[in-house]
Amino acid sequence: MKDQVKARFDSKPTVNFSDVSSGAWYYDAVQMCAKAGIVAGYPDGSFKPNQAVTRAEFFKMVAMLYSDTLNTPITGGIFKDINGHWAEKYINLLQKLGIVKGDNGSARPNDNLTRGETAAVMNRILGRVVNNSSFSDAKVAAAMKTWPDCTSSHWAYAEIQEATNSHDYTWDINILTYSDHNGIFKAIIKNLQNPVTERWTYIKK
């Protein structure tokens, strides 16, 4: 969380949504995001916690963690389906950071977000670079938690395994420094175009 986002969180009072009770399992998470300015709810005072989230909505939430970069429009992205979209600058930011990769040149901003897509984005935010070869150790493969509806052939298999198993690992880090030509922001990111592979060494139960 950027310093200015944290400052906003620390200074903002509790946000009361009409449909989020203090006893709800997600109450603390909603409060954290609302106080940090990551989510705002709806004009009628509701949050709609059970409503599906679109890719654009989620990408904006993630981009707000980097809100110091959003005062200047971020253009020149690679996605062909976001020109003029309300979330264009947020998606372009995340694409430049290597967090959003899209699908054949499309960001599909109005599609509902899937759990697999969520896992992939969160892994990239946290710098967790993984693929199916990460689990090549036989003992690791035998010990890790798996899911009956997510087999190794699923595109998000490695991402979901990474997000749902606590484990030890080893890796080498390739770092590249990125600065866009307008000087809008500078970020140090892993070279996701040629990533190193995280090797799992032990599953924590």
Label the model's feature ranges.
Residues 1-27, 40-56, 64-89, 96-115, ...:
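Feature responds to low-complexity, polar/acidic, surface-exposed segments characteristic
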